Amino acid sequence: MRFKAAWRLVAYGIVSLCVFLNVSAFAQDPANKPNADLQGVELIRVSFSQLTPDATVCGLSLGVIQPLLKNKLMDGGFIAIPETDTLATLGLMTTYDQGRNACGTSATLGVYKKVSYFDESVGWLRAGYVVLWQRGQQVQSGVANHAASTAVVVQQLANTLIQSWREDNQTTQ
């Protein structure tokens, strides 16, 4: 009886995996690509969300991270200016585990475009931001290495953004 139950579990696992792979493949189909993308984006304002209190304990500083990201994006072809409707925003959510003397950071880099729209529920024009592109990555390390580990993650996210931007603008450049 245990043998049948084990095989049944394996069969369910294989079916679940096939369904997952099918959904993942479908989600990557160019026909399902979102309408919002980076096509035509050239000018950006690079912004940063506030660091958590634990970030200081973990050695993170916006004074180090800000120029790292901004320079990476500019080297990749973006033009950074102080005023534009397109934002590239980096958020770093950091926690410190005192018991293990370790830090964890969840980094999110996104590109957002300010748009105006008519809100029928209130009857007037509003403004807000739409997501053009967004990715995230996590890193865990000891306190002594966390700033360097986080810098690597920020650079990887910037590289991914630059690659996506170039792909979206292949035909327009």
Residue ranges, per PLM feature:
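Bacterial N-terminal signal peptides that target proteins for export
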Residues: 2-13
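Surface-exposed short loop/turn segments
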Residues: 76, 84-144
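Bacterial N-terminal signal peptides
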Residues: 11-22
